[in-house]
Amino acid sequence: MWKTHDGIDIKADKGTVVKSIEKGNVEKIYNDSFYGYTIVIDHGQGYKSSYSNLSEDVLVKAKQTINKGTKLGYIGDTAIGEIKDEPHLHFMLFLNNENVDPTSIFK
């Protein structure tokens, strides 16, 4: 199966620590059938970030308030839909539940 996706894949070694891009509240943590272990952070003002293909060793809990740079978990290989790809973080950004190009926040 071939599928395109929103967001970006950021190459990193398996086991690399994944940190929050900004402060916020952990909205949910779940195992997505395509993207693997995923953490969604609500940053307020309509912004949310999503971190996928994480290992099962998640370091935060749902409803937890976090700061910018909080360790969320580690790069894993749980994204069944991208299992043939090199280890990476699948990162998505949303504004008012609409997908936003994540590269727009990196300068």
Predicted regions and their residues:
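Short glycine/threonine/proline-enriched tight-turn/helix- or strand-capping micro-motif at secondary-structure
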Residues: 1-20
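Short alpha-helix capping/helix-loop boundary micro-motifs
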Residues: 12, 57-60
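Short polar/acidic secondary-structure junctions
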Residues: 15-16, 30-32, 80
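Short acidic/polar mixed-charge low-complexity motifs
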Residues: 16, 45-47, 98
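Short, well-structured beta-strand-loop connectors
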Residues: 17-26, 59-77
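Zn2+-dependent peptidoglycan hydrolase active-site motif and core
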Residues: 20-58, 87-88
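Conserved, short, structured surface segments that act as functional micro-motifs
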Residues: 37-40, 64-107
